[in-house]
Design a protein with these regions (language model features):
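Conserved beta-structured recognition patch
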Residues: 151-165, 175-232, 306, 379-527
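Solvent-exposed serine/threonine-rich low-complexity stretches and specific carbohydrate-binding patches
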Residues: 321-335
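Bacterial Sec-dependent N-terminal signal peptides
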Residues: 1-52
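Secretome/extracellular-domain signature
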Residues: 107-167, 332-436
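A structural motif detector for short, solvent-exposed N-terminal "entry" segments of globular domains
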Residues: 44-87, 260-318, 392-407, 418-431, ...
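OB-fold single-stranded nucleic acid-binding module
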Residues: 37-267, 534-537, 543
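Residues within well-ordered beta-strands of beta-sheet-rich folds
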Residues: 78-80, 127-129, 182-187, 234-238, ...
Length: 543
């Protein structure tokens, strides 16, 4: 049996890119050595201000006294103040600044200046002479020590601070990069959930759907004893690190004041069904063999509580053309050819909590004609869509999904009456091309609050509505795999029913099936554990 993950598919291409990139670097270094001697410099002046990105890269694990020679001719740094000591929750005496300058990356640095740090406010723009100071890591935090207050010049106030949304997993993977920067941990819940009497004080893990990160609150913080912690919120704050005896950095997130916390919801919004995978392009002809995989988060009797699944195919030949005037129901306006959307009604059968079920073609085979039968699996709705129109809308078609180019996707809805205003309970998209969203007219495909999408802009001050795919930050999508290879797209993650959220966001793993592949390959841990990936590639787990 053959199985390739998307990561594995990229190895060869990435290796070649590294070879090319390293060759370019070698050539650039050689040319620079030959042609950039100081006496031959063709003009210009070295900036007095060293980017914080470059400053941090000077540190190699030992204290470094800074001077013009090791700072490439510079003597100072500049940045925007992000520290706010009014809440008494930041390391005492640290002035923390960040800069968005080099390579489009945000980098920050901390400067211990004692009580004077409290005199600066977020948004102050400062220039700091650091010649003669020492770059060192103290208490786990990289700092510029030995800077006097007189070396700091405030040149402006009220400068905007970027709302930098960062996944907790990225912070944990690269703690040095995010240290001393202002970040937003979005859609975060306490894990484990806290009691109503809990306070902020101490270390509490929060989860944003990517990983857990520690929310740290000093016992002396002005809000340490505040109660009624939020069920789901955005936590703005500054990342600081702790360092163990082996030099390993562990990040923690510190809000500055309670103004850094933005509540999103007070009760769980549990999806009764979640999308866990799809077969959009079997080996051979697709017609009647495409299928979608789901998992129930509770017992459902579809005869009592009906659902529906809608597939959208935005290939150039689908009808009607242009933006989806009726959203997911746009296929109802097609009269000939392939319709833009196609619907399956789920009105019979039952499914238990944690059970997989399928919707799709009547072929019920794992990888197209002549492959392993899936007829014994739980199929809630299956019919030959090459011969029959959809349930309510959608014209018969040889392919539900596009295999490349413009975007395709599918969503599951509670109920069978779908119109322009109907929101799904879960949705995924593959690709982003085509006429999908028109901001001026408000036409598009509606999304749900998931690990991928948000119905409001969680970083906006007034939670601006973003109800459609490609509106606001709703730009995430899965990718198309190589055509006609028989890739099943496994979407593995962890969904917490009690919290109504993804504790680990879904990851697309493309498994190249054969005609004899077993059901366990798309429902179990496959590929299995390895030295590189000890957990293997499991399907979505309901917690």
């Amino acid at each position: 049996m053959v199985a390739k993950t998307i990561d594995q598919l990229k190895i060869k291409d990435t290796h070649m890119k590294k070879i090319i990139f390293n060759s370019i670097i070698l050539l650039a270094v050689t040319l620079g050595w030959l042609g950039c001697k100081k006496e031959n410099y063709p003009g210009g002046t070295v900036s007095s201000y060293l980017p914080i990105y470059d400053l941090r890269n000077l540190y190699k694990g030992v204290d470094l006294t800074l001077n013009a020679d090791n700072m490439f001719g510079s003597t100072s740094v500049e940045g925007i103040v992000i520290s706010d000591h009014s809440g008494h929750n930041l390391p005492s005496g640290l002035l923390v600044i960040e800069q968005y300058r080099r390579l489009g990356l945000v980098r920050g640095i901390s400067i211990p200046i004692g009580a004077a740090a409290a005199e600066y406010a977020p948004g102050d723009s400062v220039q700091i002479n650091i010649a003669g100071s020492v770059l060192k890591r103290l208490d786990g935090i990289l700092q510029i020590t030995g800077v006097s207050s007189s070396a700091i010049t405030k040149i402006a106030t009220g400068r905007p601070i970027p709302k930098n949304r960062v996944a907790s997993s990225k912070i944990k993977e690269n703690p040095n990069d995010y240290e001393s920067t202002f970040v937003a941990i979005v859609k975060a819940s306490f894990d484990p959930a806290v009691e109503s009497t809990a306070t902020y004080a101490g270390d509490k893990p929060i989860n944003d759907g990517f990983d857990n990160i520690t929310l740290h609150t000093e016992a002396t913080a002005t809000f340490a004893n505040a109660r009624n912690l939020n069920f789901n919120a955005v936590y703005y704050g500054i990342v600081f690190n702790k360092q163990d005896v082996n030099g390993k950095l562990t990040p923690e997130h510190r809000i500055r004041t309670l103004k850094d916390v933005k509540a999103l919801s007070s009760v769980p919004e549990v999806a009764p069904v979640i999308i866990t995978g799809y077969m959009a392009d079997v080996k051979g002809g697709d017609g009647n063999y495409e299928y979608m995989q789901f998992k129930a988060t509770k017992f459902i009797d579809f005869s009592v509580t009906p659902y529906s699944v809608v597939v959208t195919n935005n290939a150039g030949a689908t009808n009607p053309t242009g933006f989806p005037t009726l959203g997911w129901a746009t296929g109802s306006r097609a009269t000939t050819g392939n319709s833009r959307t196609f619907k399956f009604n789920l009105t019979s059968g039952t499914v238990n909590k944690g059970e997989f079920f399928y919707v799709g073609g009547a072929g019920k085979m794992i990888n197209g004609s002549g492959s392993t039968s899936m007829s014994s699996s739980k199929w809630i709705r299956a019919f030959d869509y090459t011969k029959s129109d959809g349930d309510g809308f959608g014209l018969k078609t040889t392919g539900l999904f596009a295999n490349s180019g413009n975007a395709s996707g599918f969503a599951i809805f509670e109920g069978t009456e779908i119109d322009v205003n109907t929101d799904p309970v879960d949705v995924v998209f593959i690709g982003s091309g085509g006429s999908l969203y028109n901001a001026e007219t408000g036409l598009g495909y509606r999304v749900a609050n998931t690990d991928l999408y948000d119905k409001v802009d969680v970083l906006s001050d007034n939670l601006k509505p973003t109800p459609f795919y490609l509106s606001g930050t709703n730009t995430m999508n899965f990718i198309y795999t190589e055509a006609d290879k028989g890739y099943f797209n496994k979407l593995g993650g962890i969904y917490d029913v009690a919290l109504g959220k993804w504790m680990k966001a879904r990851r697309q793993v493309a498994i190249e099936l054969t005609k004899t592949s077993a059901l366990s390959e798309i429902e179990g841990v496959f590929p299995g554990p390895s030295e590189e990936n000890p957990e293997g590639y499991p399907s979505t787990v309901i917690k």
